[in-house]
């Protein structure tokens, strides 16, 4: 499915929450799951592929076999983030509204090849991964759950160790994406018909 990437007027080198955004242009891209950006490229995830575009919207690289080499079987990529030359992707085997083999797969941002995975902690209560964000200040990776949006789940980015879950109030239903900026978590949600 072809989606569009909206290029906003925010400098990507700085992770600051702005007060006003204006649409500058629309860039047609493959994929419709997640979008991340660094100072040179846009990264887009489809359910089963990763794409890399330059700032002019030209396809620079793609990985249509992103599940190769993963320690656990998977069939779905959700949200992504990019930090320090690595793409962090929420990945799972998704079947009938539940996720299994949830993991944060880490890819090289230059080649889009898999490097390692951060294992999911089943005792956390998380049953699916829809949103993913890297907290650059706290050195954490956060995952959200579309099925049960009461919590977000945090992992140490360097060690991969599960750290904690945070109870959200009020509870955002049907979360789709999350992003960390300036110590705040931004959460997007859909209407339940994703």
Task: Please place each PLM-identified region on the residue numbering.
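Beta-strand-rich domains and repeat architectures in extracellular enzymes and scaffolds
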Residues: 22-48, 76-79
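Surface loop/turn motifs at the tips and blade-to-blade linkers of beta-strand repeat domains
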Residues: 23-29, 64-72, 118-127, 166-172
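Residue-level detector of Asp-centered blade-edge/turn motifs that repeat once per structural unit
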Residues: 37-39, 82-84, 134-138, 180-182
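Short, solvent-exposed loop/turn segments at conserved positions within beta-propeller repeat blades
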Residues: 44-45, 95-102, 145-150, 191-194
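Short loop/turn segments that connect beta-strands within beta-propeller blades
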Residues: 54-58, 108-112, 156-160
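Blade-loop segments of beta-propeller domains
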Residues: 59-94
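Beta-propeller blade signature
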Residues: 101-110, 155-156, 194
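Loop/turn-rich, solvent-exposed surfaces of beta-rich toroidal or solenoidal domains
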Residues: 170-194
């Amino acid at each position: 499915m072809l989606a569009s990437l909206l290029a906003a007027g925010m400098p990507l080198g700085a992770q600051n929450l702005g007060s006003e955004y204006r649409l500058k242009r629309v860039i047609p891209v493959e994929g419709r799951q997640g979008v991340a950006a660094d100072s040179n490229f846009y990264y887009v995830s489809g359910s089963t592929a990763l794409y890399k575009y330059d700032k002019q919207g030209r396809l620079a690289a793609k990985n249509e076999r992103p599940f190769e080499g993963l320690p656990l079987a998977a069939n779905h990529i959700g949200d992504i983030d990019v930090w320090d030359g690595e793409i962090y992707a929420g990945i799972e085997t998704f079947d009938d509204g539940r996720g299994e083999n949830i993991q944060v797969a880490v890819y090289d941002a230059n080649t889009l090849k898999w490097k390692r995975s951060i294992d999911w902690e089943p005792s956390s209560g998380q049953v699916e991964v829809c949103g993913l964000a890297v907290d650059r200040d706290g050195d954490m990776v956060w995952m959200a759950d579309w099925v049960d949006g009461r919590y977000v789940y945090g992992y140490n980015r360097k060690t991969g160790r599960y750290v904690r879950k945070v109870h959200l109030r009020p509870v955002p239903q049907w979360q789709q994406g999350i992003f960390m900026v300036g110590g705040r978590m931004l959460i997007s949600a859909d209407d339940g018909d994703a």
